[in-house]
Amino acid sequence: MVVSAGPWSSEKAETNILEINEKLRPQLAENKQQFRNLKEKCFVTQLAGFLANRQKKYKYEECKDLIKFMLRNERQFKEEKLAEQLKQAEELRQYKVLVHSQERELTQLREKLREGRDASRSLNQHLQALLTPDKPDKSQGQDLQEQLAEGCRLAQQLFQKLSPENDEDEDEDVQVEEAEKVLESSAPREVQKAEESKVPEDSLEECAITCSNSHSPCDSNQPHKNINITFEEDKVNSTLVVDRESSHDECQDAVNILPVPGPTSSATNVSMVVSAGPLSSEKAEMNILEINEKLHPQLAEKKQQFRNLKEKCFVTQLACFLANQQNKYKYEECKDLIKSMLRNERQFKEEKLAEQLKQAEELRQYKVLVHSQERELTQLREKLREGRDASRSLNQHLQALLTPDKPDKSQGQDLQEQLAEGCRLAQQLFQKLSPENDEDEDEDVQVEEAEKVLESSAPREVQKAEESKVPEDSLEECAITCSNSHGPCDSNQPHKNINITFEEDKVNSALVVDRESSHDECQDAVNILPVPGPTSSATNVSMVVSAGPLSSEKAEMNILEINEKLHPQLAEKKQQFRNLKEKCFVTQLACFLANQQNKYKNEECKDLIKSMLRNERQFKEEKLAEQLKQAEELRQYKVLVHSQERELTQLREKLREGRDASCSLNQHLQALLTPDEPDKSQGQDLQEQLAEGCRLAQHLVQKLSPENDNDDDEDVQVEVAEKVQKSSAPREMPKAEEKEVPEDSLEECAITCSNSHGPYDSNQPHRKTKITFEEDKVDSTLIGSSSHVEWEDAVHIIPENESDDEEEEEKGPVSPRNLQESEEEEVPQESWDEGYSTLSIPPEMLASYKSYSGTFHSLEEQQVCMAVDIGGHRWDQVKKEDQEATGPRLSRELLDEKGPEVLQDSLDRCYSTPSGYLELTDSCQPYRSAFYILEQQRVGWALDMDEIEKYQEVEEDQDPSCPRLSRELLDEKEPEVLQDSLDRCYSTPSGYLELPDLGQPYRSAVYSLEEQYLGLALDVDRIKKDQEEEEDQGPPCPRLSRELLEAVEPEVLQDSLDRCYSTPSSCLEQPDSCLPYGSSFYALEEKHVGFSLDVGEIEKKGKGKKRRGRRSTKKRRRRGRKEGEEDQNPPCPRLSGMLMEVEEPEVLQDSLDRCYSTPSMYFELPDSFQHYRSVFYSFEEQHISFALDVDNRFLTLMGTSLHLVFQMGVIFPQ
């Protein structure tokens, strides 16, 4: 059997075939072993048969009745087995024919869909051409009427493409009339009014026709071929009714494939009517004949196998009889042999029965599956027919719009009323495409829509006076998509949902009856479910199919007639069975004789002996081949069912998206009917509304097109977009409302690439995302591409609350910069296997910034590598600001973040969640780069910051009065981690960046918790101490006066520390007004404590200049204000800070062998800055570490060992 899996088959199916072959190899070895065992049993049976014949030869009268009874039972058993085998062969033949017919029909439907897409694309391009302004070389005197006529012609062509082939003859008259209408509509208006054409009554009657019968043909003359198949538990009755003109031989060939009814049926009848549809042709008939020819050799093979099995069964029965007779006469010498033979015989029968039951259950399952798919295809055909009828009605209505109004039919109808009629037809089309079970929910919506149509046909003065609102319920109900896209045609029909799930090594099938029925009916429905079998090899595939009441009385009558015809055939088969049984008996006797002669080495019968043994071996091989062939057929059916299921799933998704697009188009048409309101019109005219309609049509085409057509349609979409922009350029276009994406669709997607972080202004760059998932590692690459290749910026992942911030920014700039407090969600979790990092950087960028971003994330096994590179910013806007007026500086409110409280009992891996808040002002565009490495048990973090260039002179020429910015520092509470057993818990670094007009420094905190260490971080904000109050409200250039914090280092208590690695932090040069960094590093290696403190030369003038520095600062501010008023170029502010008093940590340790010191290094800073100081400490292998920052004090504690990093920035005056 050759099965075509359709266009969706892939390499996965091939891998499944290989897996099945691998699984069948052990079964082959097992079958070989069973063959050897059976061979031994056969030898014993032959001996038993010989003894039985000898007993019969000597005419033992005492066992004559027993022999007759045994032969009678043997005859009955053979008859039942033959009937069962014939029934299974017929069922397989029937399913093969059914699968081939379904495959051909699916191919034709795909071709129709492709042609329909091409026609819809042509229609869309024509509508786009209507929107574009007329050019001198393309107008050619055509007016709007002629273009609409061309559009109607394309719509007629689309209808023809969607219609079946055999409808062309019936629609010839309709096409001729349509062509005449088009010609009349394209003529001048004077000629049209002179020659008024009548609308044919036939077309109006066809619009009102609705087909209630779900199985009726599309047209009265269209032939149908109905297949009525009834499946019972052990009986299959199939009726093939050919309603076409054909010869008697063809009908007889169709009937020949029908099976013989079985007598043991016990389940309720499950009827299925299969409509071959109008798409079948003579090619399908040829395929059926070819299948019949191929099946004839298989029938001969089955007969031969039956003969062999009959001989084997007779031998087994004789052996059983001999064993019973020997047991009766108590032959002690062969008692053990008799018991073993009986036990083996019982086991053999049980295994064979179990195998037959398993195969029967699998066949029953596939029967149900094919049955449900056939019903679903029938319902889809009915939906297609109804859609064609509705499209024909809509086409006729459009033709009526093109025809000139007649005095007897106009009756005061204007364009508004005709549009209302079109909306009604569109609503009817949407109802046809929607499932039937939504009709009850949409009744209120339909009533409201009817009222709107009546209101829209009223005069415009009345409409403006009584403005109607669209109810929210109707909009919500329009967005509802029914998961059961294959419901019955009417809402009163019941639904039967069959949920079948295929797993790797088992098949679970469930039949759910969703109607009110008795318990017996539900139990009968469940009885057809199969037992889980071990031969399934496909992956998890879920399928929901619907069963509808499709049977009829005519099909039942056909079944009875076929049964009457098959009774003579059954009698003939029984007679053949009796003849074969007699031949089998003679063959068995010959086999017994041959074995006995071989035992006594009779040379005269040597040839006969060899032939009998050869036949025995051939029988075993044929049986094994038959089993393998059945397994192959089952596998092919499984592959076919899975491919059809994938195709149906994709079609359902396309249908759902098409319904959503049709709902949007219907709402747009309803908006055209509503009266124009003063706050919504905004200068919109008919051309702009048509442009919006074309956009919705393009969206519908994209939804209906398959995924592989996206690349082909890119150029078409670009041209369409350009045409829409050109057509809407002369007019004022309204702001388009962004559509909300439903949460269900976002949850179903594994990776959702949304455009929520698009550029706020035209200067923002484009970003491309490339994500690769592998088996045990995740490599994520975020590549930032833009016009400026030199600069890179961090990836912006906008949170959900960004829209609120954007709305606040649109209202206007906020004068003071106040910081808000926001608490992150608490994440309680008991068991996490792997928690991967999430980088969230909410950007707040101004229009003058041009930044680009690139981030690389990699998580491999136990390694996490994260790089954040924020490119520097160019100052190209300085010259523009000289020409423009003084713009107010935006004041933003930063969030105070409270880290999540993580409650966790067992965490295997908890990776970091870095969050960065970036806020840049007009004059500050720093370059920032961060690199996170979490590799095995190490955490590295580096912060690199470039120099911040400031062009204050240019800004102060245009903005003499620079407002001072007052900021409140962020209060950050680091996450409290409560954990019993942590394998690896990586840190959660959080960086807050806020740069005012003169530039603020960075703050960084790094901590790590490795193996079984517990980390607690406490961040203390910077404390500003400005003793002097600002006298003036707006000095030209504020000078900052800061006092450094006094930091007291904690005591470190440790008994045994082998190694403690700390995280270094690098500090680079800062501009004049920026605060410096301080870094400290601690190292203890092997039981050694290294402490190095390098203090630069501290001039003794520091203490004396403390108080004088404050006074001088106030004087310099006043002096700078006066100078700024004169020349508007104040000097750069100098920062005067107070030195920090540092208490060195007290280290208590029992066993410290060595203490290594690390020399400190000094970095040169600009004129107003002092030296940097760095202290370096290191601990290794049972670590103690502590981190304290000037801006952010962070404490880290670990379970048995601690990790400490101390960061401190100190300014030493020279």
UniProtKB/Swiss-Prot annotation:
Give coiled-coil spans as residue ranges.
70-128, 292-399, 610-670
Compositional bias, Basic residues, is annotated for 1102-1121
Instruction: List cellular component terms (GO).
Output: cytoplasm
The Olduvai domain extends over 165-259, 436-530, 707-799, 800-888, 891-946, 947-1038, 1041-1114, 1116-1214
| Entry's localization field | Cytoplasm
Give the miscellaneous note.
Answer: Encoded by one of the numerous copies of NBPF genes clustered in the p36, p12 and q21 region of the chromosome 1.
From which domain of life does this come?
Answer: Eukaryota
Q: Which family does it belong to?
A: Belongs to the NBPF family.
Q: InterPro entries from the xrefs?
A: NBPF, Olduvai_dom
Q: Which UniProt keywords apply?
A: Coiled coil, Cytoplasm, Repeat
Instruction: Give the UniProt tissue specificity note.
Output: Widely expressed. The only tissue which shows a weak expression is kidney.
Start-end of Basic and acidic residues biased regions: 190-200, 461-471
Q: Which segments carry the region annotation Disordered?
A: 162-200, 433-471, 722-746, 791-837, 1102-1136
Acidic residues biased stretches? 165-177, 436-448, 801-810, 821-833
Return the protein name. Answer: NBPF family member NBPF1
